Every structure is written in structure tokens, then in C-alpha cells.
């Protein structure tokens, strides 16, 4: 019982178990390939990043890919998977967030983030892509996957430049020049 201070490196070759909350004052590094947080309690486990500094900055979660060689277009930078049981109690990935390098060219670096969901056969398809554009400070966004995809806008759609429609357009109420 009581506090234990280890003035140097502590080597644990088996499982380290604590019966209370473990507090690390300082950095914590794990050289393992996976860390698992498991709980049989509803709405748990939780991972909390809490910044208690009185300033305008938020906590940061970094996904860093440093492969020891030059980066290349389409390098994967980070993946968040959302997996659960289907009705046969099989573990199925239902959604993913994937970040990749769109352009690795020095001085023209550009990124890409994709939101993906499982479609009717469980196959992962990209529904939203936010991608580096073809000019500085330009971002392109693609919504949907395939010509049968439906994009619904519940409120107003504001187009601040040209509207380019490739296909059939059905307009129920048209007021372009002030007349209906």
C-alpha cells in the first residue's frame, strides 16, 4: 500500500494489473502493436483527452506515419474503424474514416479524407471525399457513390459560383429572374 516511486525504467515482462486508476505524470509510450481497452460496462470503455489549461487550445490526437522513406501519393495516414455485430453476431465493419496523401509533392502537399460505409453486401464504399484541389487553397468534395446514390439537402442549397448539372434536372419551382 502507498505510493511507489521508481527513479529509473521499470521493466514488466508479464501483465501489469492495477486495481485503481493508474496515473502517469509525464509521457507514456507503448512499443506494442496494439493496445486494447475492454469493458463489460454499458457505454464503456471511454478514452478521454482532457485539456485543463485556461487557454483557447484543445487536446490533440495525432496520427503520424513516418515510414523512414519519402512519402508517396495515396499513402495511408490513419484509419478509424467502426465495427459491431450483424444479426448473425458476426463482427462487421460498418463505417470507416480514412485519411491519405493526395499529393506528396514537396511544396504542393495535399490531403484526402474519406468517409466510408458498408453497403448492402458489407462492402466498404466511399460516400464522402474531401480532397486536395487542383490549385492552392482549393478543396474538392465528392458526395455519393455511383449514379444511383441520392443526396438530400434538407435546407437551402447555396451555390456561390456556377451550377454544373450533368444529367436530367427536374425543377418544381423556378425563380431565376424574379418571376415564378
Residue ranges and their predicted role:
Residues 1-73, 88, 101-102, 107, ...:
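Intrinsic low-complexity, repeat-rich intrinsically disordered segments enriched
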Residues 73-81:
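Short, hydrophobic/aromatic-rich segments at coil-to-beta transitions
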Residues 89-96:
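Amphipathic hydrophobic-ligand
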Residues 110:
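Short glycine/proline-centered loop/turn elements that form peptide/ligand docking sites
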Amino acid at each position: 500500500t502507498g505510493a511507489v516511486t521508481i527513479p529509473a525504467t521499470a521493466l514488466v515482462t508479464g501483465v501489469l494489473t492495477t486495481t485503481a486508476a493508474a496515473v502517469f505524470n509525464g509521457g507514456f509510450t507503448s512499443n506494442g502493436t496494439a493496445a486494447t481497452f475492454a469493458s463489460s460496462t454499458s457505454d464503456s470503455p471511454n478514452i478521454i483527452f482532457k485539456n485543463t489549461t485556461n487557454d483557447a487550445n484543445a487536446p490533440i490526437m495525432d496520427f503520424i506515419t513516418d515510414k523512414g522513406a519519402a512519402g508517396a501519393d495515396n499513402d495511408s495516414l490513419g484509419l478509424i474503424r467502426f465495427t459491431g455485430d450483424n444479426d448473425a453476431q458476426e463482427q462487421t465493419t460498418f463505417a470507416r474514416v480514412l485519411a491519405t496523401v493526395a499529393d506528396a509533392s514537396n511544396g504542393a502537399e495535399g490531403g484526402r479524407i474519406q468517409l466510408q460505409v458498408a453497403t448492402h453486401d458489407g462492402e466498404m464504399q466511399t460516400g464522402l471525399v474531401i480532397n486536395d484541389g487542383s490549385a492552392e487553397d482549393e478543396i474538392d468534395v465528392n458526395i455519393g457513390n455511383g449514379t444511383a446514390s441520392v443526396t438530400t439537402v434538407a435546407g437551402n442549397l447555396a451555390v456561390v459560383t456556377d451550377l454544373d448539372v450533368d444529367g436530367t434536372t427536374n425543377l418544381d419551382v423556378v425563380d431565376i429572374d424574379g418571376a415564378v
